[in-house]
Design a protein with these regions (language model features):
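Positively charged N-terminal leader segments that act as targeting/secretion signals
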Residues: 7-15, 23-25
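Residue-level detector of alpha-helix boundary/anchor positions
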Residues: 2-4, 56
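Bacterial Sec-dependent N-terminal signal peptides
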Residues: 19-49
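Acidic, metal/ion-coordinating pockets
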Residues: 47-383
Length: 383
């Protein structure tokens, strides 16, 4: 029993009394409660809209070439610790990603096998890591690899088949060969699509725009976020600038990275990651989607030129909305020491180089790169 207006009213009649009473007090109460209800409803709608603006943020970590040593032509090209510690200095950063990407610059193949044509095996750049090295990738946090490059066929069909077998068994996703043009996978409720392209034999061709559009558009139709990787552009420090034209190197058509990236985004890509030039290049933003034109040499033990710009690289930390739009990011700078192996660079050389190249090559780009490595969007692009 409750007392209202000094009358005893049974609980069963309270609601009826409240709704039908004509007293001034009850009319005022109904007005106040109606106002509170409407205000609360508007607030909830506003909160719901705010949550849906970026309802879920995903973190992508991305690096360039990884080759942790080769047992060809012999085991002297492997590190003294058998590769165990090469990725440990950067594991904490790499493992932050919902998706952590790299370009696999070689194959996993312990045994002997056919090798690509070489006149002198001591000067032949053919890379095969022992089978158990795949565990080092898993331990570091990598779960997505491009195999579209000039080294995936170094040891013929046998080396390639062994590599994809080990990647499958380890749970690492991959794409880039004619046999494996794309892959989709799900993590934490987000469906990802991934495709990789190159100019090399047996890979999905970067310069075949019609086929690339078809693959990317298909992924866009079945995925929340589409990631595209390409192995293209001329190599070396002298070729680090974006020309916006077709790049020819060693008499090979290495594509037009600037044009390809925009074509990919127009077709449905949300993130475009480049590698191949072996040095860092500029970053870009197109239709709210992030582009990295070259991620450089990240972890390449022996047999690589690591002098100057060849020995520095970024770890990109990219925050995307669940629809793939770029929100914010950070450039973590690394350098390779000794025969190779990444460590954090306190001088932030990769950051400084990428910032400089972006400002020089893409002055219209609205990305803002801070001295601390943070990447934000300019007001023009946000609009």
């Amino acid at each position: 029993m409750r007392l209202y207006n000094k009358k005893l009213i049974p609980k069963s009649e309270m609601l009826l009394y409240f709704c039908t009473s004509k007293t001034p007090i009850m009319e005022d109460m109904r007005f106040i409660l109606t106002f509170i209800f409407l205000f609360a409803s508007v607030s909830l709608i506003g909160q719901s809209h705010h949550r849906n603006f970026h309802p879920k943020t995903v973190k992508i970590m991305a690096v360039g070439d990884v080759m942790l040593g080769t047992n060809f032509p012999d085991s002297t090209y492997l590190s003294p610790d058998d590769g165990k510690e090469l990725l440990l200095p950067v594991k904490k950063i790499i493992s932050k990603g919902d998706v952590s990407f790299a370009n696999l610059e070689g194959v996993f193949w312990t045994g002997e096998g056919e090798i690509k044509k070489c006149q002198d095996s001591t000067k032949c750049y053919a890379f095969k890591m022992p089978d158990h090295y795949v565990d080092y990738f898993v331990d570091a946090g990598f779960n997505l690899l491009s195999i579209a490059n000039n080294h995936i066929r170094d040891f013929g069909a046998t080396g390639t088949a062994n590599t994809v077998r080990l990647l499958d068994s380890s749970g690492i996703h991959y794409a880039g060969l004619v046999e494996y043009p794309y892959v989709t996978f799900e993590k934490d409720g987000i469906r990802y699509g991934f495709a990789a392209f190159a100019h090399n034999k047996g890979t999905v061709k970067m310069n075949d725009y019609a086929n690339a559009r078809k693959i990317i558009s298909h992924l866009d139709s079945i995925s929340d976020i589409v990631i595209v990787s390409f192995h293209g552009g001329a190599e070396g420090v002298a070729m680090r600038h974006i020309t916006r034209e077709t790049e020819i190197f060693l008499e090979e058509d290495r594509g037009n990275p600037y044009e390809f990236a925009r074509m990919a985004i127009d077709a449905g890509a949300d993130l475009v990651l480049g590698h191949g030039p072996h040095v860092p290049r500029a970053v870009d933003l197109y239709k709210g989607r992030f582009i990295a034109y070259s991620l450089g040499n990240f972890a390449t033990y022996k047999r690589f030129n690591l002098s100057g710009m060849n020995g520095i690289a970024p770890i990109l930390e990219l925050n995307l909305s669940e629809s793939g739009e770029f929100i914010s990011g950070k450039i973590h700078s690394i350098r390779q020491i000794g025969e190779g192996g990444p460590v954090p660079d306190k001088y932030h050389r990769a950051l400084k180089e990428i910032k400089k190249l972006t400002e020089e090559d893409l002055p219209e780009c609205t990305l803002k790169i801070g001295a601390d490595g943070t990447i934000t969007r300019g007001e023009e692009e946000k609009k």
